[in-house]
């Protein structure tokens, strides 16, 4: 949550006072407008839900995301070999989600501690960096998964070479490099700040000092790493749906998995990514250009809505495991097989322990002369 240190000008300050002594009324009105636009900063009015909503969402995301992505990584590493191309992308997506959920306990404590950051400036920067790496890494890997499925559905024969695991590994490495390089400025812009009450805030965007340049950077990343992938995904899904309609794929596994993929990915974008990017941009714009007394109430609403979308943006770490289960190559079948095998192994271990206990107890009974066994 961005803790903006904005000093407020009292509402009772009149135009003549702002213009300064000795000015005519007309000049004082113009001067007062200039003074307000240049020095006035709205003081945010924060409601109680903002301090409880985000930690509640983060707790939910941590529990579900940790369990879901742990199982997914376990499956990909031990039960999904040899990997297909789409399995490579899904493994990297699960890895990005898992790294993000590991950072959530510190953020949960931050909000329960009345947004007083105690972990230092470096940890604050790392926290915000990993969030953005997960955000844009997830978007790019979902784009890769969508393009991969598009090639398999629309050009099943021509794409055989392009769908190989080796190509998917190279593309995944490239995605990680692009994301890390593109998000590295976050390590400069984010950080901690001291409030008037001496508590420490951890900026999720940046301080007012760097706000103008951060807005430009944010718009560039939004266009390059959100808007462009979204257009590509929509194009792939449009062509996939068209191919499914005109090709004879009734009740085939490829048709079913493709439909699940379209539904899940579009849901993630509609619920998590689109609202977050829209409200983040509006919040930054409000901090920069909407600082007048008449706009303060509007800014409060924008800020509150932005906090809601921040929670929604983290939900993708819970939804992605559903994608592996429904749209992955043989993931559901192999998960069922792995759980049955683990269950049988557990039953065998329990039976073995029971037999060992019986063998250990039997001599004692015989030694005591008890033959009731």
Curated annotation (Swiss-Prot):
One of its GO terms (biological process) is positive regulation of cytosolic calcium ion concentration. ATP functions as antagonist and inhibits ADP-induced mobilization of Ca(2+). The P2Y1 receptor-specific antagonists A3P5PS, A3P5P and A2P5P inhibit downstream signaling mediated by mobilization of Ca(2+) from intracellular stores, and platelet shape changes in response to extracellular ADP. It is found in: Cell membrane. The chain crosses the membrane at residues 52-74, 88-109, 126-147, 167-188, 215-237, 261-284, 304-325. Pfam families: 7tm_1 (PF00001). Residues 1-51, 110-125, 189-214, 285-303 are extracellular. It is a multi-pass membrane protein. GO terms for cellular component: apical plasma membrane; basolateral plasma membrane; cell body; cell surface; cilium; dendrite; glutamatergic synapse; plasma membrane. PANTHER family: P2Y PURINOCEPTOR 1 (PTHR24231:SF2), PURINOCEPTOR-RELATED G-PROTEIN COUPLED RECEPTOR (PTHR24231). This is P2Y purinoceptor 1. It comes from Homo sapiens.
């Amino acid at each position: 949550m961005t803790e903006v240190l904005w000093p407020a000008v009292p509402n009772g300050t009149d135009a003549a006072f702002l213009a300064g002594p000795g000015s005519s009324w007309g000049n004082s009105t113009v001067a007062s407008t200039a003074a307000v636009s240049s020095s006035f900063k709205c003081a945010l009015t924060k409601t109680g839900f903002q301090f409880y909503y985000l930690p509640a969402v983060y707790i939910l995301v941590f529990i579900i995301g940790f369990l879901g992505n742990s199982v997914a990584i376990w499956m990909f590493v031990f039960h999904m070999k040899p990997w297909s191309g789409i399995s490579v992308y899904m493994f990297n997506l699960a890895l990005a989600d898992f790294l993000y959920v590991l950072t959530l306990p510190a953020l949960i404590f931050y909000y329960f501690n009345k947004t007083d950051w105690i972990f230092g400036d470096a940890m604050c920067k790392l926290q915000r960096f990993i969030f953005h790496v997960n955000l844009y890494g997830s978007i790019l890997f979902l784009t890769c998964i969508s393009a991969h499925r598009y090639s398999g559905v629309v050009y099943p024969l021509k794409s055989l070479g392009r769908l190989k695991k080796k190509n998917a590994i190279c593309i995944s490495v490239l995605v990680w490099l692009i994301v890390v390089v593109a998000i590295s400025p976050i390590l400069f812009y984010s950080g901690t700040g001291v409030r008037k009450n001496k508590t420490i805030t951890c900026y999720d965007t940046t301080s007012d000092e760097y706000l103008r340049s951060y807005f430009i950077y944010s718009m560039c990343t939004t266009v390059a790493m959100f808007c462009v992938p979204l257009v590509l995904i929509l194009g792939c899904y449009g062509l996939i749906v068209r191919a499914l309609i005109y090709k004879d794929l009734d009740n085939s596994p490829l048709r079913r998995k493709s439909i699940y993929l379209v539904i899940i990915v579009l849901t993630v974008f509609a619920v998590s990514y689109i609202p977050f990017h829209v409200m983040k941009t509006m919040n930054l714009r409000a901090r920069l250009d909407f600082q007048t007394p008449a706009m303060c109430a509007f800014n409060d609403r924008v800020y509150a809505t932005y906090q809601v979308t921040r929670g929604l943006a983290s939900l993708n770490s819970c939804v992605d495991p559903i994608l592996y289960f429904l749209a992955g190559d043989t993931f559901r079948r192999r998960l069922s097989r792995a759980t049955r095998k683990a269950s049988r192994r557990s039953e065998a271990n329990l039976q073995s322990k029971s037999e060992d206990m019986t063998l250990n107890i039997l001599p004692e009974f015989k030694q005591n002369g008890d033959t009731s066994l």
